[in-house]
Amino acid sequence: MDQSKGTVRGFGARLVVAVPYLWLVVFFLIPFLIVLKISLSQTAIAQPPYLPVLDLSAGWNGIKTFVAGLDLDNFATLLSDDIYARSYLKSLEVAAVSTLILLFIGYPLAYGMARAPRRLQAVLVMLVILPFWTSFLIRVYAWINILQSDGLLNRVLQAFRLIDTPVAWLSSDTAIYIGIVYSYLPFMVLPLYATLEKMDETLLEAAADLGAPRWRAFWLVTVPLSLPGVGAGALLCFIPITGEFVIPDLLGGSDSLMIGQTLWTEFFSNKDWPVASAIAVVLLCLLVVPMALYQNLQTKNVAG
């Protein structure tokens, strides 16, 4: 009886461990392999709109024909046309600059929240996540009304006589950065707050006892201890911003072509699934790099 209970418990423990891996296989690995397969195919006027299609009913010959029909032409297309390289570089530039802006804005906010009275902290956290209760698309559309020529921002600036004529905020990089910072600020603030809130206050007291002024204690104690939160917040912002489509499409101009817009055009307008899939594969490979670097740093910190 005890042996059977131990067997059941052992199976249950293995099942619990296997569930996350099963989740990754079903919702990440299999979809990625499908996208990778399409990226190695050729565009066709068919359904689905690419060839070759694996025909298992043909047996081994069908598999050989399928493999022989795969090539790297779509990736060569990405290298031959400058528009794709410019889109990737623009996306990485916007993501990097936006992440830095979010860090400079989010760190003081998170620090203030972590130092606020305990009862007030819950209210502040709720205020940070409150925008998520509204549709993302509606929030972006609201910025169109705010940033347009006769919008709220221009009216306020003119009322304070800071500008004489309305500024063309829309269809510019400035509008994109405003929309991104507004939309992704909670993703930076919450990891930073979680890290700063758990910090041991006695470390700052010890630094003060040793004669360190508050600003020096902040840079030597608080900042290093908050780096895991900085890294987590940066990843949570940088990765989705790189593939952002809605904000640059609604707030940006023709000179603000990001890779998400290029992918959407290839997939829906040009109906070129293989090239769109190749764009997605390259984008994923680019985003794996910062994730791997962050994981490597985390491993070194734990080992150290």
State what each model feature region is:
Residues S4-G6, Y193-A208, P274-G304:
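C-terminal transmembrane helix and the adjacent membrane-cytosol boundary/short C-terminal tail
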Residues G6, G62-I63, V140-V181, W215, ...:
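Membrane-interfacial helix termini and adjacent extracytoplasmic/periplasmic loops
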Residues D81-R115:
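Transmembrane alpha-helix signature in integral membrane proteins
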Residues I30-D82, I146, D150, V156, ...:
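Short membrane-interfacial helix/loop motifs at transmembrane-helix boundaries
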Residues M1-Q42, A122, M126:
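N-terminal signal-anchor/first transmembrane alpha helix
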Residues G12-V17, P108-W143, L204-E205, F218-W219, ...:
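Cytoplasmic-entry segments and transmembrane alpha-helices of multi-pass inner-membrane transporters
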Residues V19, M126, L130, Y182, ...:
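Transmembrane alpha-helices
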Residues F245-W273:
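Glycine-rich helix-loop "coupling/hinge" segments at transmembrane-helix boundaries
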